[in-house]
Every structure is written in structure tokens, then in C-alpha cells.
Amino acid sequence: MSDRDSTRISPAEAHAKMTSEGFAYVDVRTEDEFAAGHPAGARNVPVMVAGAAGLEPSADFVSVMEGAFAKDAPIIVGCKMGGRSARAASALGAAGFTRVLDQRAGWDGARGSFGELTEPGWSRAGLPTESGSDPRAR
């Protein structure tokens, strides 16, 4: 799956793949964002972390993923609106992960140039959610 467009899926498609095809959902938002609400059953591995100038790329994102998943594991990555998950999917693909899908619209939804909602995210699509920290977090 090298074509970026073919690896982006809707929240409903992500949920279907989790329930019927055994895909793991990795929420790449910060720990605080994850704790406030996330897709039910998701794992939290932040691709960006707080730094001196705001959010910065996590130096150990790929190594944490390599420790948690086989390179051929079916994985969906998601974030708040779709930007960080695209970064995560790209990093994982470059590291040799072969079955990574990027959930477009993230948790909250995709926004247009004027801030209007253009596609509802997981939380707005009525899909199963939960809150709290990831007990598997490092």
C-alpha cells in the first residue's frame, strides 16, 4: 500500500476493520488528548510530544511501535484531525511496516480552510468511545 490515498480510510471503515478484520487502532495524539476520549480499544503511542516550542516529533515513536507490533501487523493510526496520523503512517511505512492504514478526519473531524467541519471524526460519527489513560503506555 504505497499510494497515500489508498491507505486513508473513514472512521466507519476503521471501526469495521477493527471489528471484522482484527486491525489494532493506535491513537497517536498526546497522552492527555487520549485520556480525554479515544476509540474503544485503542492503544496510545504519541507521534508528537510536548517540547520547548510546543509539540515536537517523538524521537522514540517508531521504536515503541516496533516493540509493540510486528512489521506485518494490521494497524490503523488516528489523531485529532488527520495531520499527525499521516505523519505516523509515513514514519511507519518508512520503517518497514506493511499494513498501516491512516484514519482520515481523526477523533474530532476534518476542517476546511474556514474552520468548517468537512468530515466528522470518530467521536462525531457515533462510534464506540472510552476515556482514560492507556494501561499499556510506557
Q: What residue ranges belong to the model's regions?
A:
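N-terminal glycine-rich beta->alpha transition that marks the start or flank
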Residues: 27
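Rhodanese-like catalytic fold shared by cysteine-dependent sulfurtransferases
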Residues: 1-23, 31-74, 83-138
